[in-house]
Amino acid sequence: MATVTTLSRAAGGRGNPSNKPYLVEVEIDLAAAATAKGSALAANDVIEAITVGANTVVMFAGAEITTAPSGGTGASFDLGITGGDVDAFVDGMTLTGASAGTYGTLANTATPILVTTSDTIDMLLLGTTPDTAGKVRVYACLMDVDSVGSSKEADEVARDYLA
């Protein structure tokens, strides 16, 4: 089993990531993942897709096939948090034979997950022979739940001393 880390993208994205929900996405190229690994992808390989910071709630996450996968036999994947629930968001999405535009069905247990220490949303490859080509868009709606700061007293910023 191998973990491919070079395709992971730091949390950020559209919207205002200051204690408001925001969307993060990354496109996983299966051929690039194999190149980054240094050998063919195999069952039980983990592809880290999205880095999630500490004290962040993953409100939901999902996957969409953007380029039809090929070169595999009976391949599928789970989407979740490998150190926790590996199929928290998508359970057994088919890769082999899937068409572009196919979305993974959210797992019945897909509920918000609080990530208290930095972690990643991962694809866990399943099946006989994972596909060697194709692209999958992984997306997540995140929200920082860290403290918004202090008491907001007037002495917090230098400009307040100028008056």
Describe the function of each predicted region.
Residues 2-163:
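Surface-exposed, low-hydrophobicity beta-strand/loop segments enriched in small/polar/acidic residues
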